Design a protein with these regions (language model features):
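Bacterial N-terminal signal peptides
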Residues: 9-17
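N-terminal secretory signal peptides
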Residues: 25-70, 74-77
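Beta-strand-rich cores of mature extracytoplasmic or soluble domains
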Residues: 95-122
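Well-ordered alpha/beta subsegment
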Residues: 28, 116-139
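Bacterial N-terminal signal peptides that target proteins for export
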Residues: 1-10
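Short, surface-exposed secondary-structure edge patches
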Residues: 81-84
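Loop/turn positions that initiate beta-strands
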Residues: 88-90
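N-terminal signal peptide c-region/cleavage motif recognized by signal peptidases
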Residues: 19-21
Length: 139
């Protein structure tokens, strides 16, 4: 039975590979020496963000709904994916300012945002309570 299950799993993975399916890339967010995975969105802007890593930023509260940080230079967005849901924990780029915004609560879609990826609940809580501590993103 185990051999059949293993064989089926391998064949399923090979089928995805042959069909050209891609697995979502994961990057790391580090706060106070603890690492939290972030699943990147599957779009060109998320890949461009990942290409700039490692990157260390300081986040601040922007109202009560998001934490924002300002990378230098600002992130340019070329291929915005429009009309996506923004559940809490979504990491985005705000096009007009080129800053990163992580949403602490569910938020309505906004054409000025492009999706970068999704933090885990544990990662979101770490960022929410990070104050002005450095936050490092890496491959």
């Amino acid at each position: 039975m185990l051999t059949k299950t293993f064989t089926a799993s391998v064949l399923a993975c090979l089928g995805l590979f042959v069909a050209g399916a891609t697995m979502a890339e994961t990057i790391q967010m580090t706060i106070d020496g603890k690492h939290y995975p972030i699943e990147l969105a599957e779009n060109p802007d998320a890949r461009n963000f990942a290409a700039r890593l490692p990157m260390t930023l300081t986040f601040e509260n922007f109202g009560s709904k998001e934490r924002i940080a300002y990378p230098k230079p600002a992130i340019k967005v070329e291929n915005t994916v429009r009309h996506f849901d923004i559940p809490q924990g979504t990491m985005t780029i705000y096009k007009p300012w080129g800053n990163i915004a992580v949403f602490l609560v569910d938020f309505p879609w906004n054409d000025d945002l492009t999706n970068l990826g999704k933090l885990t609940d544990e990662g979101l809580e770490a960022l929410r309570t990070s104050g002005d501590k450095p936050v490092t993103f890496s491959q």
